[in-house]
């Protein structure tokens, strides 16, 4: 059918895309005018497809349709109007014009909750069922005949966002497509809306969202969640307007210890606790609010409302005192040598061993059914008094660490809703940068802004290092066993796997990674890396060494491998999450704490990773993430006296500067993975089909943004022309396109500056006399797309023969048949030595060449075959130190020698 889509937002965009995939012809997209220079997603998508787009600021004047608007609409010849989400008033001349009329999506089960704030009122009224309706438009307000309805359960703590993201958005898109399909098949019903149960409520605005405290707790809870996030339920307290978010009902009946917050009109004062703000209804029942927005717009954890409020010991209720005495009896049974267990009794000083810890934990868990208690809790609260305080906090659901408030950027993309933190991550909290400084991170697929990201300053680096140092020296990270540390890393890997599709989607958005590749490599290998190093945690061990005895006495000498302390990890933009994982997994497995500086142009998966560390239970301060510039954040990390190790992946030029800074500051330990110009030698006796396939992968894998990419191919003369012919044939089959499309082979380059460098690189190659066989230009479409490129006749003196492109540019040079030593000399005539490769069926030749190639990795009859268990790192100016494998652990450990005499 010929369809006019009238609406806006990501929902409108998705409906538009799905209708086109169904084979319908969208003849026009009608959306709202650009706001602050930013076009609506529906309009952007339609313009990209060449569909006419109209952005009328109004459709009628003085109650009459504008003739010009009607004429432009009628010229399209639409057979059906589809209104997925439309905030404008559309004249009946337009509504009734098509052969099949118009259908509208409404996010409630009509006739209930007619009006623009239907989702809000579904929650405010405490409806147990929610859903959406698709109806035939008429001249009433949401009164047209019903075509289709779908319902879902409304969860007790659902908010507008959670209900929309879980059901109304994804299922609503499917519902609109289904409705159009029914119309096309002539099977669409027209069911009059019943009058019984019909309601209409007005638009929820800030001025109408004030909380009425004279009602039960459940009604207050429904009011808060029904206005979360927009417009926000508010009250006046402490001489300012406070807006409440993230409400849950508290059914425990126990009022946690906290500080009173007087609220005018409330039945009782609120109580600020470590879990959040306890509020009371007029029925004396409670609800808990996790987040508060202050009058100046700043969002804070409700538990932090009274900054500087001292933490005091909990006063136990009668029931809790009974529990405490039962636990005292458990301690007494485990510690028979202790006459009487007092608050000051120390579990371990009283003779308990690790096996007793297990017994204590299991007995207490059985005593307190449903309690989550772990071995490390005993080590962190080893006296009876501290243990009871910890136990009661857990029983009350009052987490001592507190919960992190995350201001997400939410996006509906790749058939899912992704939630991305965008602030700095310091000491277990997402916070704004000093001075609230931010910058834009760009989607390379179309050049659009994804979101604003906090831009770290020097003071932020100092705060992050201080948090990491405190976590290392005083926190529980250094006190838990190596095996428990491994368990936390395994849990983190599991969470990364649970979020694998979301992480891959973020990599595609932020870095231009092809989604299908990101699932397997960018994210898949990241998960494997954390699992691999989690297994190493309890296998890091020293040795005993026989030395000359100090006769007549004897000696025992042993070594211990210890973490170095606070580490700075500076990662590149080509594999944002994988490069983070390669270094951070080994760093954490060794017992260090870390400050991570992601590449400024690709910060988002690092911030999502930070969120997952919290969910995994990694203690606060162990992992910190600072998006920002290398010249500021990276430099401060290199200079900081409390940072003991820098792990860096990037250019040789910057690596040299970091090495110098580390030496001058405090002689930091350094590992560097730097530039490359990896040679790939293809002999005439190779399997040519495999050589072509792997040669393509060696250059074009991940758009050529690959540190070990084959920077130069040496092809034996007798097969050179056939090799080039086959490569060009394969290049022309590659699909360049949106990285989220499942059939895309080649996505956009990472950022605009890099695209421009690739253009200059190819222009210089042509200027110096190399033959440009194909490619060499930007793809004529929005975004930072560059054509897969092939150069031949490349001589050793040329710029492109010596310098890395870091892009999809294949550099091919000939070498004379049988001249193995000369081609080896040419391959090694570079200051780089990251990787290399050889293709031959001759095992003797393969062994000889692999011996002679001066590179940290040599691939024989394969390429790009890295593995988490195999050490990875370069020679010469490609750096030193290893990622992956057991060798990587040594980069984050120091060896201590201990000698006894007896």
Curated annotation (Swiss-Prot):
Keyword Cytoplasm listed: yes
Listed GO MF terms: formyltetrahydrofolate dehydrogenase activity; oxidoreductase activity, acting on the aldehyde or oxo group of donors, NAD or NADP as acceptor
Post-translational modification: Phosphopantetheinylation at Ser-354 by AASDHPPT is required for the formyltetrahydrofolate dehydrogenase activity.
Residue stretches making up the Carrier domain: 318-395
Swiss-Prot/TrEMBL catalytic activity: (6R)-10-formyltetrahydrofolate + NADP(+) + H2O = (6S)-5,6,7,8-tetrahydrofolate + CO2 + NADPH + H(+)
Pfam family, one: Aldedh
Protein name, entry field: Cytosolic 10-formyltetrahydrofolate dehydrogenase
Organism (species): Pongo abelii
């Amino acid at each position: 059918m010929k369809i006019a889509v009238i609406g806006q937002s990501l929902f409108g965009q998705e409906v538009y895309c799905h209708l086109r995939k169904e084979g319908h012809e969208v003849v026009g997209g009608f959306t709202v005018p650009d706001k602050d220079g930013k076009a609506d997603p529906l309009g952007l998508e339609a313009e990209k497809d060449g569909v006419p787009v109209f952005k009328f600021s109004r459709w009628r004047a003085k109650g009459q349709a504008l003739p010009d608007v009607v004429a432009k609409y009628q010229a399209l010849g639409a057979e059906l109007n589809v209104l997925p989400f439309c905030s404008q008033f559309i004249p009946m001349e337009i509504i009734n014009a098509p052969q099949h009329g118009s259908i509208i999506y409404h996010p409630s089960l009509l006739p209930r909750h007619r009006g623009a704030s239907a989702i809000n009122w579904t929650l405010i009224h405490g409806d147990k069922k929610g859903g959406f309706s698709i109806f035939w438009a008429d001249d009433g307000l949401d009164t047209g005949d019903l075509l289709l309805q779908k319902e879902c359960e409304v969860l007790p703590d659902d908010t507008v966002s959670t209900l929309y993201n879980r059901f109304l958005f994804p299922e609503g898109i499917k519902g609109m497509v289904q409705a159009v399909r029914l119309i096309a098949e002539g099977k669409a019903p027209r069911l009059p809306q019943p009058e019984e149960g019909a309601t209409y409520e007005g638009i929820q605005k800030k001025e109408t969202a004030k909380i009425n405290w004279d009602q039960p707790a459940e009604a207050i809870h429904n009011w808060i969640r029904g206005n979360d996030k927009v417009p926000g339920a508010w009250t006046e307290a402490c001489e300012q307007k406070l807006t409440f978010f993230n409400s849950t009902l508290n059914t425990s009946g126990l009022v946690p210890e906290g500080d009173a917050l007087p609220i005018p009109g409330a039945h009782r004062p609120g109580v600020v606790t470590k879990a959040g703000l306890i509020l009371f209804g007029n029925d004396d029942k409670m609800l808990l609010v996790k987040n508060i927005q202050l009058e100046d717009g700043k969002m804070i954890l409700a538990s932090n409302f009274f900054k500087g409020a001292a933490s005091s010991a909990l006063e136990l209720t009668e029931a809790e005192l009974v529990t405490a005495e039962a636990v005292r009896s458990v301690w007494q049974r485990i510690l028979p040598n202790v006459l009487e267990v007092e608050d000051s009794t120390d579990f371990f000083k009283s003779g308990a061993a690790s096996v007793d810890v297990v017994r204590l934990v299991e007995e207490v868990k059985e005593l307190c059914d449903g309690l989550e208690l772990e071995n490390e809790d005993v080590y962190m609260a080893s006296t009876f008094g501290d243990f009871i305080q910890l136990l009661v906090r857990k029983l009350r659901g009052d987490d001592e660490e507190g919960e992190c408030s995350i201001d997400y950027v939410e996006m509906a993309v790749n058939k899912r809703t992704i939630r991305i933190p965008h602030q700095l991550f310091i000491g277990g909290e997402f916070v704004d940068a000093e001075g609230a400084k931010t910058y834009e991170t760009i989607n390379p697929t179309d050049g659009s802004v994804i979101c604003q990201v906090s831009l770290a300053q020097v003071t932020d680096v100092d705060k992050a290092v201080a948090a990491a140092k405190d976590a290392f020296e005083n926190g529980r990270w250094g006190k838990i066993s190596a095996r428990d540390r491994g368990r936390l890393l395994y849990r983190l890997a599991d969470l990364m796997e649970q979020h694998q599709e979301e992480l891959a989607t973020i990599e595609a958005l932020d870095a231009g990674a092809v989604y299908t590749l990101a699932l397997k490599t960018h994210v898949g290998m990241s998960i494997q890396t954390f699992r691999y190093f989690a297994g190493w945690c309890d296998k890091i061990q020293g040795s005993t060494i026989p030395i000359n005895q100090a006769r007549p006495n004897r000696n025992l000498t042993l070594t211990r491998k210890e973490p170095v302390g606070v580490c700075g990890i500076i990662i590149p933009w080509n594999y944002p999450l994988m490069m983070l994982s390669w270094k951070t997994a080994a760093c954490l497995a060794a017992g260090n704490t870390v400050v991570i500086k992601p590449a400024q142009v690709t910060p988002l998966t690092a911030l999502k990773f930070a969120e997952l560390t919290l969910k995994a239970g990694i203690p606060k301060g162990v992992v910190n993430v600072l998006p920002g510039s290398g010249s500021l954040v990276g430099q401060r990390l290199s200079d900081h006296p409390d940072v003991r190790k820098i792990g860096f992946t990037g250019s040789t030029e910057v690596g040299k500067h970091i090495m110098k800074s580390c030496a001058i500051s405090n002689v930091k330990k350094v590992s560097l993975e730097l530039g490359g110009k990896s040679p790939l030698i293809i002999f005439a006796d190779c399997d040519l089909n495999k050589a072509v396939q792997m040669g393509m992968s060696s250059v074009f894998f991940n758009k050529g943004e690959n540190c070990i990419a084959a920077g130069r191919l040496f092809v034996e003369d007798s097969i050179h022309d056939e090799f080039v012919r086959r490569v060009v044939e394969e290049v022309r089959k590659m699909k360049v396109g949106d990285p989220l499309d499942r059939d895309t082979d080649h996505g956009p380059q990472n950022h605009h500056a890099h695209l421009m460098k690739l253009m200059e690189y190819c222009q210089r190659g042509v200027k110096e006399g190399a033959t440009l066989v194909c490619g060499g230009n930007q793809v004529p479409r929005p975004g930072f797309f560059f054509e897969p490129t092939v150069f031949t006749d490349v001589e050793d003196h040329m710029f492109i023969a010596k310098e890395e492109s870091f892009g999809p540019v294949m550099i091919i040079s000939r070498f004379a048949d049988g001249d193995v030593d000369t081609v080896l000399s040419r391959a090694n005539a570079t200051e780089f030595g990251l990787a290399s490769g050889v293709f031959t069926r001759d095992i003797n030749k393969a062994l000889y060449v692999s011996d002679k190639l001066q590179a940290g990795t040599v691939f024989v009859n394969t390429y790009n075959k890295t593995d988490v268990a195999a050490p990875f790192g370069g020679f010469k100016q490609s750096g030193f130190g290893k990622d992956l494998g057991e060798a990587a652990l040594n980069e984050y450990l120091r060896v201590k020698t201990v000698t006894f005499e007896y």
